[in-house]
Amino acid sequence: AEDFSVVAFCFGKRLNEELGNLPIGLIGSYWGGTAIEPWMDEFTLRHEKLEEKTKALTAGWAPTANSSLYNAMIHPIINYTIAGVVWYQGEANNERHQDYGVMFDAMIRGWRNAFHHYLPFYFVQITPWSGYADKNAAYLREQQADVAATLRNTGMVVAGDLVNDLTDIHPSLKRQVGERLANMALKNSYHKEDIQPYSPMLKSFRVDGRKVIVTTTAIGKLACKDKVIRHFE
């Protein structure tokens, strides 16, 4: 797997192990460091009235031009029987986070129109990185979470706890990321009832003096890597 995505390989490996050595076919359609617009088909961009807004920002040749990667790497496989999609992207849209949720939702719907309307779509919420400007990444994560909460047959895994070095935009613990994605597929696509794949999500909060009491949907208790919480988004 030297030239294949580590996250995707670990995803497939766990599926294979949990499903009794069932052969798992993986298609690697990815290009690192790209924005979401090149992965959206032209019809979706026009229909959602996003084309003019994004054209100037993504002008040029592949992999930056609108729809370029969809045309080259997704459209050629639409006649395959695809069981689902694993998506790990978002960092390149950090500075234009305002429209990410709309574009992500539209892209998923566009792919479903091309493949099939119940296409499962499991994705990774972007991880912390010291190079992100201000609060942009937090706003983008929020939009990713909104898509998972509102669009059927989607699932989001959190990987913020898998970052050992905040100066490295590429988390080193890729096996765990792939396995968390696999757990999401095992639970929702393969109906493995004994697997709990969901990451902690904000349920509610209340202010108590100088404290903010946060309630999450986590199963069990949460732990902090350090003795005190230094960051909260």
Predicted regions and their residues:
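Cell-envelope and extracellular/periplasmic
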Residues: 1-233
